[in-house]
Regions:
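Conserved, single-site charged/polar hotspot
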Residues: 2-458
């Protein structure tokens, strides 16, 4: 059994520690941040899943592993030591020092011995190797250095239900692969993170034969626009009945164009319709925390809808001032961890704005809804259809349209009820919509070309 204490000094000055390519994929390899920032570790443990040891070295500018030494031990711990990116490697149980890495331009790299070996790190099983970057507070940023196809195999079952139809999983694989090719976190030393800021990735824990097949079937395929990989391939859980133009949420992106989505209505979506209620005091506090000092909130209403029926402007009127927010802020401004409340999508109404004051009675006097958004009804032609927020109905006083309008929602009891459908920013592919299309027999490329305008897949 090899237990060596080695110290290496590298005279390497040509490449900066923070230099990461603008294109994330170098030699088909990604650097994925799995523990960083507040999640960085004082001591980082690894356990080889198959009982083999590890090689010590570093990853060069081409992401090729440069071998320095090895150990037969299967459980090891890394801790920052000395200055710069100096790291000490010990055997986890005994504390015996196995390797001492001293840097002058690179970071410690570790990879398991053997081909296709997987390694346990903080309860998750990862393919590939690891890189360790020392932080000023003595913690370690842990980076998984992994082949892009193995990375996608780790993303798909965390971003989409692993038991969904193959075509939906294939569409998700192409989206995940395309998203990953643009570096998102160069200042942190990795390309993409493993959290919701990028794409959820926890290695191999949830992978199945089906999710792996979705990646293998689409190997190397990405979404292209204008001859280049599309660099903003975003997706959402569900859109509530319509996607949105990116210009109305973030900024203009030519392949993210709003359109009515007839497919979500064809599958079961848990918690598709939702309601959240805020008090005036809660909204006042939330706005103040986000830098809007308008006094006590007196009124909140949707000031503008997009042609797709999504919200593009929300106005808050206070005792001292008023403010109108636009785009994605219409949704995110309502988020509060303190009150554990949020608005789930861009598709909503507030009190009477876009709904009928006091609610709409359906079937009998005991069933009341506040919005027609997402409601299924029997049409004059005898078909069941899902409404998108308004409809013409025959009442005792004649035909009229309900569910329309942007009337300010003055609160009589100091509360504001927001009713909506869908989950997410309403941009790009609806994951539930992809599921529905797959169930109807559409292929993954047909799914992607519905949700992303004028793209090619290659």
């Amino acid at each position: 059994m090899k237990k060596r204490v080695l110290s290496f000094l590298f005279i390497i000055t040509l490449f900066s520690l923070t230099a990461v390519s603008a294109s994330a994929v170098v030699n088909d390899t990604l650097k994925v941040g799995i523990r960083w920032g507040d999640m960085a570790l004082e001591a980082a443990n690894l356990e080889n899943a198959v009982g083999s040891g590890y090689e010590f070295g570093y990853y060069d500018e081409d992401r090729e592993f440069v071998y320095l030494d090895e150990t037969d031990e299967t459980t090891i711990t890394m801790q920052a030591s000395g200055s710069g990116n100096d790291v000490t490697v010990t055997e986890t149980r005994s504390g015996e020092v196995l390797f001492q890495f001293r840097d002058n331009g690179y970071c410690l790299g570790i990879r398991p011995m053997g081909r296709h070996t997987e390694t346990w790190c903080k309860g998750y099983k990862y393919p590939g190797g690891f890189e360790y970057r020392c932080n000023a507070d003595g913690t370690l940023t842990v980076i998984n250095v992994v082949n892009i196809e193995d990375y996608v195999k780790g993303v798909v079952p965390y971003e989409m239900d692993k038991d969904w139809p193959l075509a939906a999983l294939e569409a998700q694989a192409v989206c995940a692969r395309t998203y990953a090719v643009k570096t998102r976190h160069p200042s942190l030393g990795f390309d993409v993170c493993a959290g919701t800021d990028c794409q959820v990735y926890y290695g191999r824990n949830r992978a199945t034969d089906m999710t792996d097949a979705a990646v293998d079937n689409t190997a190397g395929e990405m979404i292209y626009y204008g001859g280049k990989p599309a660099d903003t391939v975003v997706y959402c859980a569900s859109n509530g009945g319509a996607t949105e133009d990116a210009a109305n949420v973030w900024s203009s992106i030519p392949y993210l164009v709003g359109k009515k989505d007839p497919y979500e209505a064809k599958t079961n979506i848990p918690n598709y319709n939702w309601t959240v209620t805020y008090t005036a005091d809660e909204l006042t506090w939330i706005l103040e925390q986000k830098g809007y000092s308008i006094g006590t909130v007196k009124n909140v209403y949707v000031a503008e809808f997009t042609p797709m029926g999504n919200v593009s402007k929300v106005t808050f009127e206070g005792s001292r001032d008023s403010v109108t927010v636009k785009g994605e802020t219409c949704r995110t401004i309502f988020y509060s961890s303190t009150y554990n409340k949020s608005v789930k999508s861009q598709r909503f109404t507030i009190n009477g704005a876009g709904a009928v004051s006091g609610g709409i009675y359906i079937n009998d006097s005991n069933t009341v809804i506040r919005s027609l958004e997402g409601v299924s009804v029997l049409s004059g032609g005898g078909k069941t259809v899902r409404l998108d927020g308004s409809a013409s109905v025959l009442s005792a006083s004649g035909t009229s349209t309900v569910g329309e309008g942007q009337t300010p929602a003055f609160s009589k009891d100091g509360t504001f009820t927001i009713t909506g459908s869908g989950s997410g920013h309403n941009l790009g592919m609806s994951q539930y919509g992809a599921k529905a299309m797959a169930e109807l027999g559409y292929t993954y490329d047909e799914i992607l070309k519905f949700y992303y305008t004028d793209i090619t897949i290659k």
